[in-house]
């Protein structure tokens, strides 16, 4: 009894810490997004959004091959050699890369945008790494403090600089550098030891996980990246604002669960309870479908009027918003399933599935965007992540229940623009019934294995 109570307290503490960190992100977004969208024209806001997106790619390219393997082999607070190795590797790679990126913009008159990309990327990488360290060492409140520090510094800096008419890209870069300072302040002390250390993980694992993460991010942002050459700047700003809204709402909710659960599921797997871990992951996928369905239904019932009160008129397009909500849910399902391949050390499956989904999905997104503008970009993103999730299910031994729920959900959202509001809500309700049925079946499996 005492053991179960201790475990429950650990879960509660972790969930509370992550919740506080996510709420801080939402509050920051509630401050930042309306200010920027009201102060800036859609064209100006689009330039800031694109700088942030490219900065994310900088972070992925320079840091993910180190951060993701560290997440699988984190060591502990008592054994910090892996942390020391990862810290040194990141410094050696990221700092020279940032200098090269900034200098690369000089010949083309693009120093400002390149500074924004490099600064934002450094901030995201540093903040993500330190937060990951604390999370995997089961120190959730240190994790929360790290994220809140980074989020707060980035938000305050970018809003303050934009309000005093600093160039948007420069503001983005300065905000990223401010969060680097915060990450360094809250970082654990490095372990003493030899300056040279053998890599704790294989090169193939790091590269495979990094390529999978890069492909995932490309699918997330590809629509925003190609829209400037296909539609007007106003539509680019609309799409960027809706994408950020989805990321900071349903994306934040799903991210909370993902963040809390992964370290504990990895611990459960390492203890030898592999079947139970797989069943939990399957259940998470179905619950994600339910969250997506209820989110779509809630937006349909409320309409765009409430959202326009926050953003101002002309930012929200309902079919686009619904497709982006569904794409976020599908992407999280794929991420959950990828945990199986990470835990089994089959990282090549993540690489292959993600790259194939990205190739096919990006081609679909281009074609759909050419035909339907921002609606096509959102639908292409949904198709990309649906394919990503289905490919990840191969060789995962998770069964068909999450697949059934996912396909029902995607079908309902995809046919939405062809139906009137009432018919679409009825179909969405039917998808909820299907997902609930699969959820109950999987829950019985979890209960039996426990």
What are these regions (language model features)?
Residues 1-4, 419-450:
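Membrane-proximal transmembrane or re-entrant/amphipathic helices at the cytosolic face
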Residues 12, 49, 75-93, 273-290, ...:
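Interfacial transmembrane-helix starts/ends
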Residues 13-25, 29, 150, 170-186, ...:
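Transmembrane helical elements of multi-pass membrane transporters/channels
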Residues 25-29, 33, 51-71, 116-135, ...:
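Short runs within selected transmembrane alpha-helices of multi-pass transporters and secretion channels
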Residues 30-34, 45-62, 223-224, 237-254, ...:
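Alpha-helical transmembrane segments of polytopic membrane transporters and translocases
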Residues 42, 104-120, 298-335:
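Interfacial segments at transmembrane-helix termini and the short loops linking adjacent helices
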Residues 60-78, 242, 246-285, 338-343:
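Helix-loop junctions and terminal segments of transmembrane helices
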Residues 89-213:
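Hydrophobic transmembrane helix module of multi-pass membrane transport proteins
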């Amino acid at each position: 009894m005492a053991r179960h109570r201790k475990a429950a307290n650990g879960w509660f503490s972790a969930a509370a810490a992550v919740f506080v960190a996510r709420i801080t992100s939402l509050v920051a977004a509630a401050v930042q997004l309306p200010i920027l969208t009201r102060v800036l024209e859609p064209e100006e806001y689009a330039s800031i959004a694109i700088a942030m997106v490219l900065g994310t790619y900088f972070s992925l390219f320079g840091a993910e091959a180190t951060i993701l393997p560290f997440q699988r082999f984190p060591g502990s607070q008592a054994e910090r050699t892996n942390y020391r190795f990862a810290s040194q590797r990141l410094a050696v790679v990221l700092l020279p890369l940032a200098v090269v990126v900034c200098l690369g913009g000089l010949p083309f008159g693009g120093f400002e945008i390149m500074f924004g990309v490099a600064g934002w990327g450094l901030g995201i990488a540093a903040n993500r790494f330190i937060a990951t360290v604390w999370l995997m060492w089961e120190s959730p409140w240190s994790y929360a403090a790290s994220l809140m520090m980074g989020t707060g510094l980035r938000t305050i800096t970018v809003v303050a600089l934009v309000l005093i008419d600093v160039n948007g890209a420069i503001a983005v870069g300065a905000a990223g550098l401010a969060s680097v300072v915060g990450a360094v302040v809250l970082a654990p002390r490095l372990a003493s030891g030899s300056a040279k250390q053998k890599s704790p993980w294989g090169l193939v694992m790091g590269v495979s996980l990094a390529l999978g993460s890069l492909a995932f991010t490309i699918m997330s942002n590809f629509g925003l990246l190609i829209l400037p050459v296909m539609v007007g700047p106003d539509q680019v700003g609309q799409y960027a604002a809706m994408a950020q809204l989805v990321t900071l709402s349903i994306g934040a909710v799903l991210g909370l669960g993902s963040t809390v659960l992964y370290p504990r599921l990895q611990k459960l797997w390492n203890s030898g309870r592999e079947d139970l871990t797989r069943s939990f992951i399957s259940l998470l996928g179905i619950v994600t479908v339910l969250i997506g369905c209820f989110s779509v239904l809630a937006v349909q019932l409320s309409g765009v009027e409430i959202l326009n009160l926050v953003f101002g008129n002309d930012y929200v397009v309902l079919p686009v918003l619904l497709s982006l909500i569904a794409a976020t849910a599908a992407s999280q399902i794929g991420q959950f399933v990828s945990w199986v391949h990470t835990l089994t050390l089959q990282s090549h499956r993540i690489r292959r599935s993600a790259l194939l989904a990205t190739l096919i999905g990006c081609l679909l997104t281009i074609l759909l965007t050419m035909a339907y503008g921002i609606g096509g970009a959102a639908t292409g993103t949904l198709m990309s992540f649906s394919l990503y999730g289905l490919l990840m299910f191969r060789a995962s031994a998770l069964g068909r229940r999450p697949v059934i729920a996912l396909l029902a959900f995607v079908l309902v959202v995809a046919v939405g623009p062809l139906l009137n509001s009432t018919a679409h809500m009825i179909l969405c309700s039917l998808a909820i019934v299907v997902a609930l049925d699969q959820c109950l079946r999987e829950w019985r499996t979890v209960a039996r294995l426990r």
